[in-house]
Every structure is written in C-alpha cells, then in structure tokens.
Amino acid sequence: MDEKFWEKICSLQENGEFEKIIKEIKKLPEDKLDMKLINVLSRAYINLEDFENALNTNLSFIGKAKEDVTNADIWLFSECGWICNEVRDFEQGLKYLLEAEKLGRDDEWLNTEIGQCLGKLDRVEEGLERLKKSLKLIEVEDTENIYKKIFIYSEIGYLYELLENSEEALKYFYIAKDLGRNDNWLHMHLWINLEKTIGKEEALKYFQNEIKTNDVNSSLWRSLGQIYMDVFANYEEAEKAFKNAFKYSLNGQYLYDRSRALMGLKKYKEAIEVLLESRKISEQEEELTDAEDIELAHCYIALKDRKNAEKYLEFVKEGIDNIHEEYIDEYKSTLAELENLINKL
C-alpha cells in the first residue's frame, strides 16, 4: 500500500473511525492483503467490540502470508486465542494458544495466557505450572516490567485460592502488594484468605492496622467499608470508611457504596443526596446511571414517595438497552421487583 493510503488509515485510527477503516480495507483485492493490513482490520473490529469478525479475520489469513509464514501464523493463532479469552470462550482460546506453541512460541505472554485459560477451565494445577513458568521467563525477557509481575503473582495467588490453599495464596498476594498493587481486587482477596487462616476478627484487625499506616489510601478505605458492611453489617463504620474513600479520591463508586451503607442505616434522605451526587458524576463521565437509579427508586419507595419512585423506575426501564446480555435476566428481575413494590404504595 502506498503512503497516502496509510496516512488515511492513521488519520481514521486517531479519530476512532473504525467502521471507515474496515470499509477501506474491505475494498482491497484479496491478493493485496498482508499481515499489517490483517492486524489493522482485526484491531478495528476489536475496537468496535465485534469479536466474531475479528476472530474470523485472523483465522482467514492463517497459512496465507507471503513471507515468514510460521511467525505470521504464530501471531494469528495467538491473536485468536486472546480474542476467544476476551469473550470467555476459554476452551477454544486454549486450542488456538496451543497451536501457537506448537509452531514455536514459548514466551511469558503465551504461558500467562495459557495459564489463565487453564485456571478458567478448572485445570488449576496445570494453570499454576504455566504461570510459574511465566515468572521465570519474565526474569529473562522483561525483568523490569513490574506490572506484568504484579499480574502474574496475583493470578498465581488466585489459583491457589481456588485450590483452597490460603497460605500459598497469601504468599503470592503479599508479593503483588509489595510490588505496588493497591486496588479493591487485591484487598478483598487478601481478606478472603486472611479470614480463612486467622478468622474474621483478626483479619479485620489487619485491615484496621493497614489503614492506620496509610490513611489516605482511598482503595483501602473502600475495601474496609465493604468488609464492615458485607461481613459485619456494621453500616455506621462502613459509611465512615466510604466517606473517607471519596475524600481521598473523587470516585463516584465510593459515593454509591456510601449510599448503600446509609440505606442500611435507614437514612434514606441522606442516601438520596449521595446517590444524586454519584449520578451526576456518572453522567459527567458518560457512564451508565442504572445502579444509582435502582437505589434511588428503592429510597423513594422506603420514604413512600410514589411520584419520585416512579420517576426513577422509568430511568431504570430506559437503561435496559445498555445492559449486557449476561445480566439481562437479573436486571429484569430487579425491574419487576421495583414495580411490585411501587404498586403496593
């Protein structure tokens, strides 16, 4: 392809015009296609979340590269494996990844992907072998890549958790923490395994001590709030923790969490104020507001305010088109529950 063609493609990529990229490449004769074009076409589909066409694009070019067919096919099988994993078809994803391995690929990325697949397929011991191999490979290939190390240590910890080996799980989670991971996922998995090894009260003390030494850590405050709320039903302490989480990071999720604690305390008017603030942030960030709308409807139902309950019920109904197919039945059930409660007012 000439320089003018690639300038146009680059411009379309920068502007996020992926449908136009697809049209431009689809105009080309089949004998003009090469690995670069196939990769651009596949990525355009991926950016549009059209994973089926992305997969078919890669599969269609296997064995057709004009140069270095083996390495081209390794890349294509690897991409196919990754795409299948993205749509949670781990069995098929594993098959493609193993094809890439048969052709000679044996690096950290491939072993990590295979390890994840095996874990998702309940072949946990095999998954651990692959991920531990990844740790060895990364020390050779990319020893300074802390983010990859954090990910692999976290995955190993998670697989040990699946095996109910909390001591080993904690060992790897602590390493991920020491390397710099600081998020709700890690904190809650630490909680799960600490609870199993030392009990709820001692596990709670661990988090209380952590927050004493790092009291501006919004993620840690949120995790502590979840523990107070979901494990101990201590809504008062949970509300304080979520309030601190928002204080140190203006994340609307923390407001939503705080509203749930306030609802647990039956402080519905305060919960409404917090939910409206959370909803405003969601709108500003162009995110869905269905979670806030559902809880706002619940609050107004509790206050026997039918007019406002119906107002937010309508927002909940409008939001159904944005719900992923995987969660649609649960969403419809929530909608029916709200309608039933409002009809009883």
Language model features: what each stretch is:
Residues K26-K32, I62-D73, K102, K136-K149, ...:
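Flexible helix-coil transition and linker loops at the boundaries of alpha-helical arrays
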Residues E7, V40, E79, E113, ...:
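"A position-specific structural signal for the A-helix of alpha-solenoid helical repeats
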Residues C10, R43, W82, Q116, ...:
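Residue-level recognition of tetratricopeptide repeat
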Residues E14, N47, E86, K120, ...:
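Register position in tetratricopeptide repeats
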